[in-house]
Amino acid sequence: MKTLNKITLDVTISIIDFLYRGRHFPRFWVLEEIARAPYFAFISVLHLRESLGLRGQVHTDLMKEHFAQTLNETEHLEEMEKRGGNKYWIDRFFARHLVLLYYWINVAYYLFDPIDAYDLSEKIEWHAADTYSKYLEEFPQDEKISAIMQDEIHHAQELSEAIRLIT
């Protein structure tokens, strides 16, 4: 599945790179819109498992962590909105349809293979950090983007820790 994760990510990145070449904030907005979906999906599945009596401290810890990650990604999304990232309806249309698909894929993926679901999300967080890093090479004075990049690195590390917790 890790190979499928890499292929999926590479294809998605290629499409987004093509559509958003030279448009930093719309690209960031789309990435942040998408970034929340796995955390919502993970929380949904963890809540379902908990409702079925399949809970434990690890479930509770993961739910808290994923909720915090969702809030943090929402703050990033709001920052990109302030910068005009969601200005055009076509960007909103694309992102919201992609996120709907991505959410349900993550629900199924996390339900049946949480380790690989976390692996895919970790790869996406590292990609987001890399995307922000490239922007910062051009605009090193942008402290807000620098802080967001650090958050993405932290999220990737948290996902790696989540994999460790459930194995």
List PLM regions with ranges.
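Non-heme di-metal
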Residues: 1-167
